[in-house]
Amino acid sequence: MSNQFSEAQHQLDALGLRCPEPVMMVRKSVRKMAQGETLLIIADDPATTRDIPSFCEFMDHKLLASQTETTPYQYLIQKGL
């Protein structure tokens, strides 16, 4: 795991879950976070490669890093406003 991913303040394990569950869990987790905090999402649903970046853009969160070459996929997001 890269150093950037290991520095996340929160972590969400969405392994084995299929659309729309991972994004629903991300949304619930982010609501509990303070602005600027980071969340590492670990998932294996191929739909997350599209859904997580779209969620971040739509909700004004920042996708800091992603690893989608191999499973499990990893996404590091930072909560926006």
From Swiss-Prot:
<dbReference type="InterPro" id="IPR001455">
    <property type="entry name" value="TusA-like"/>
</dbReference>
<dbReference type="GO" id="GO:0005737">
    <property type="term" value="C:cytoplasm"/>
</dbReference>
<dbReference type="InterPro" id="IPR022931">
    <property type="entry name" value="Sulphur_carrier_TusA"/>
</dbReference>
<dbReference type="Pfam" id="PF01206">
    <property type="entry name" value="TusA"/>
</dbReference>
<comment type="function">
    <text>Sulfur carrier protein which probably makes part of a sulfur-relay system.</text>
</comment>
<comment type="similarity">
    <text>Belongs to the sulfur carrier protein TusA family.</text>
</comment>
<protein>
    <recommendedName>
        <fullName>Sulfur carrier protein TusA</fullName>
    </recommendedName>
</protein>
<feature type="active site" description="Cysteine persulfide intermediate">
    <location>
        <position position="19"/>
    </location>
</feature>
<dbReference type="GO" id="GO:0002143">
    <property type="term" value="P:tRNA wobble position uridine thiolation"/>
</dbReference>
<dbReference type="GO" id="GO:0097163">
    <property type="term" value="F:sulfur carrier activity"/>
</dbReference>
<dbReference type="InterPro" id="IPR036868">
    <property type="entry name" value="TusA-like_sf"/>
</dbReference>
<keyword id="KW-0963">Cytoplasm</keyword>
